[in-house]
């Protein structure tokens, strides 16, 4: 698929599909250039927000909370209703002692969102159970 993307670099949904495949396999070094390309070159707000959210999560996984939140906040600035960005933000904030209450508020508000998948709801509820007790 890399060859196809190389020949068609601006087909953003295809690039996102490949980046997400890498992301889900925790191959962040392969996912990052594709998400960065979309974040920098796409005019599609949803794809740009998704890319920024995924970049933010990868940065968080590398241990840089502040930079990760910068990416996620930018994703929310351009797409305020992004469930992915909001979920990542809540998960990151709940794990930090000084922002735990804000994280709990975010994740509790997401619980009631009918657009949230059952799988994501289950993850959020597990996280809340850990930090609310």
Q: What does each of the following model-derived ranges do?
A:
Residues 17, 51-54, 88, 123-127:
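Canonical tetratricopeptide repeat
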Residues 11, 82, 116-117:
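Residue-level recognition of tetratricopeptide repeat
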Residues 26, 63, 97-98:
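Residue-level detector of the short coil/turn that links helix A to helix B
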Residues 14, 48-51, 85, 120:
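TPR alpha-solenoid repeat register
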Residues 2-6, 40-43, 73-77, 112:
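Conserved structural position within tetratricopeptide repeats
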Residues 31, 68, 102-103:
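Single-residue signature of alpha-solenoid repeat helices
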Residues 98-133:
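Terminal, low-structured helical/coil segments at or just beyond the last alpha-helical repeat
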């Amino acid at each position: 698929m890399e060859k196809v993307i190389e020949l068609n670099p601006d087909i953003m949904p295809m690039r996102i599909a490949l980046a997400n495949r890498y992301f889900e396999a925790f191959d962040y070094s392969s996912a990052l250039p594709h998400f960065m390309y979309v974040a920098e070159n796409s005019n599609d707000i949803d794809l740009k927000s998704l890319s920024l959210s995924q970049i933010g999560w990868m940065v968080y996984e590398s241990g840089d909370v502040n930079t990760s939140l910068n990416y996620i906040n930018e994703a929310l600035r351009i797409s305020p209703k992004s469930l992915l960005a909001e979920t990542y933000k809540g998960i990151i904030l709940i794990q930090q002692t000084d922002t735990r209450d804000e994280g709990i508020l975010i994740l509790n508000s997401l619980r009631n969102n009918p657009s949230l998948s059952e799988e994501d709801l289950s993850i959020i509820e597990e996280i809340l159970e850990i930090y609310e007790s």
